[in-house]
């Protein structure tokens, strides 16, 4: 696993712990539908949340959430449609969230110190904005 992959995987672990501590019920991690992936799928009460996690070691290339481009949003939406097609409830409430993790202190095995921001309803499917 190269450094960016490792950093991303560590950020996803941090995000999953954050969600669990907030009472979310995680139902899938790294869900793949064709070539598209959703980092975390979890229930926040009755709402099914499709969560993209972005992790960076500095703000040199901008805030982590800024890297969730329109193209990436479309990929997430395609994977979400695949996941929803497998469910029995066609009327389930859904939400697309982004969790941004900024690693402030890293050693060879883990991110020691970080900032985390959970952006609920970060984007909407079909949103032209």
From Swiss-Prot:
Question: Which Pfam family is one of those matched by this entry?
Answer: UPF0102
The record ties this protein, via SUPFAM superfamilies, to: Restriction endonuclease-like
Give the matching InterPro entries: Restrct_endonuc-II-like, tRNA_endonuc-like_dom_sf, UPF0102_YraN-like
- Cite the CDD domains for this sequence: PoNe_Nuclease (cd20736)
Q: Can you provide one Gene Ontology molecular function annotated for this UniProt record? A: nucleic acid binding
| Signal peptide region | none
Give the family this protein belongs to, as stated in its UniProt record. Belongs to the UPF0102 family.
Instruction: Name the PANTHER family on file.
Output: UPF0102 PROTEIN YRAN
Q: Under which name does UniProt file this protein? A: UPF0102 protein CT2262
